[in-house]
Regions:
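Active-site beta-to-alpha loop of glycosyltransferases that engages the nucleotide-sugar donor
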Residues: 32-34, 39-53, 68
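Phosphate- and divalent-cation-binding pockets in alpha/beta enzyme and binding domains
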Residues: 47, 72, 76
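Gly/Ala-rich phosphate-binding loop of Rossmann-like dinucleotide-binding domains
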Residues: 56
Length: 284
């Protein structure tokens, strides 16, 4: 697959001159799989080894988009046995509008590549700082043919607290890393069947279109706010600089220097992971 052309069997998304395909474990290509995963990332070397090992227990193959990382993310991806293909971008777009459009384009490109090179029954779309709890592979295998087209997963943010503020280290698992979580529940579409009518169009972010029957199940821990105090500040700066101010920049400006929490960002009590958290969940 050369830059500037679509992978065979696809039609919507083209590689740009700044993007190149890196083949990982070629033994995964051209084989039928039950569950394949796609992800997009930038500078995730700190958590990426654990992310790939965690995903490797659940999925058959991974396709990744690296958005011009300046750390070792690409090398980590290339060496992992479950990573089949990588799109490595060399030119990161700083423009606010371009960043928003890139979310759907990158995932659309990955989805089409997976369909062309990794025939599969189900797709799992994840971010590196997310950990779905429970038996993901077993859950998908247990879905009957007429159960649903897609699955939304209940996601909760983990928080740094006064008695749990040590930074994440790469020698430990990210799953259950933090003790406390906010009750705000976001239902994120992460799983869908490999059907041609399901796909990404221009303007889509994380969620593709074309699903008719969607159920909500499973739970997910999100660590985007809780890896470390330094990472929190970097996250604030990223949203302030590269996303629309009214919808993202304003609230993240107000969160600067507020990494350690006693309440959630929405001023609600924090809970340990488990039934009490779920019973107090507030959909947002």
């Amino acid at each position: 697959m050369a830059a500037g052309v679509t992978p065979s069997g696809t039609s919507n998304w083209q590689l740009r001159d700044s993007e190149r395909i890196i083949r990982g474990n070629e033994g995964l290509l051209g084989r039928k799989h039950h569950l394949v995963a796609i992800t997009r990332l930038r500078n995730e070397a700190l958590i990426l080894p654990d992310t790939l090992d965690y995903l490797g227990d659940h999925v058959d193959a991974i396709v990744a988009y690296d958005d011009a990382s300046t750390d070792d993310s690409v090398d980590i991806l290339r060496k992992h046995p479950k990573v089949a293909l990588i799109v490595a971008n060399q030119a990161w777009e700083k423009n606010v509008a371009a960043r928003k459009l890139a979310e759907g384009r990158h995932r659309g490109l990955l989805l089409e590549m997976a369909r062309a090179e990794l025939p599969h029954d189900w797709m799992f779309c994840f971010d590196p700082d997310e950990r779905v709890t429970g038996d993901l592979r077993g859950f998908v295998a247990g879905l009957s043919a007429d159960a649903c087209d897609a699955v939304r997963v209940r996601l909760f943010d983990a928080y740094i607290t006064p008695d749990d503020c040590e930074p994440y280290r790469p020698d430990r698992a990210l799953l259950d890393f933090r003790r406390y979580y906010g009750p705000e529940q976001r239902d994120i579409l992460m799983l869908w069947r490999n059907r041609p009518e399901i796909g990404f169009a221009e303007g889509h972010g994380r969620t593709p279109g074309g699903m008719e029957r969607v159920r909500t199940d499973l739970y997910c821990q999100h660590y985007g706010k809780s890896l470390s105090v330094d990472h929190w500040e970097e996250t604030c700066d990223y949203y302030i600089r590269h996303f629309p101010f009214e919808t993202y920049g304003r609230k993240w400006s107000e969160r600067k220097c507020q990494a350690i929490h006693t309440l959630s960002d929405f001023m609600r009590p924090l809970y340990e992971w488990g039934d009490t958290l779920f019973a107090n969940a507030v959909k947002i």
